[in-house]
Amino acid sequence: MSTPPVYITAPARERAPAIVVLPPIFGLEPAILQLADRYAQRGFLTLAVNQFWREPETRVMGRDAVERPRALERAGKVDVERIIDDVGIVIDRARAHEGCDGRVAVLGICFGGRYAFMSAARHRIGAAGAFHGTQIGLELDEGPRVACPLSFHFGALDIQTPPDEIAAIRRVTAHRADAEIVVHDGADHNFAVPGHPAYNPDVAARAERAVLALFSAMPAYR
C-alpha cells in the first residue's frame, strides 16, 4: 500500500509522544519544517505530511503572486475523504514508530486545520490542535463525534475564519469540557507561520505553549 510522504524529525529521548503535522496549502514549505524541528527539540516525535502527494503537482509551492493562485487551485481540487484516510495512515505509522511512546496527536496549520478537526472525530488520537485552521466550518457535522481534547487557536483579525464560524465550532464541540477554542486579539491569519508578514511571535508562543502542553499531557488512545 502506498503511503503519504512525511518529514520525520525525532527528539533526543528514546520514546516520546508523536505529533502529525498537517500543513497549509503550500505544502511542506521551509517554515513548516522549521516548526517540525522545533517540536522535536521540545520532546516530540514529529511527522509532517505532504497532503498533496496524490495530486498532479505534489511539490512545495511559494506564497508569491504567481504561486499562491496555483496553490489555492490545487487545494480546491483535493479529495477530502482521501486526505483524511491518508492522515489515518500516518497516525498509524506514527504510533508504530520505534520512537513513539504510543501517544499521537494531530496539529493542523491553516488548510490542515480542517483535517485536524476531522481526525479528532474519526481517528485514534489523544488530542488535536490547530493554528488558524480554515474550512472547519465545512465539517461541523463531525463535531458531536469529536473524541479527544482540542486546542484550536484563531486570530481575531482573520477573515478566513469569521466569528460565526468559530461560534459554530464551539457549539458543536460543547459536549467536551476539554475543547479549548481560543481567539487571539490582534492576530491575523498566519500568526503562527515563521517568516510570514502576519507572524505574531507573542501570540504564536502562547498558542504553541497551550497546544504542546495539551499534547504532553494526553493519554494514550484506548
Task: Tell me the role of every PLM-derived stretch.
Residues 1-222:
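N-terminal cap/leader regions of alpha/beta-hydrolase-fold enzymes
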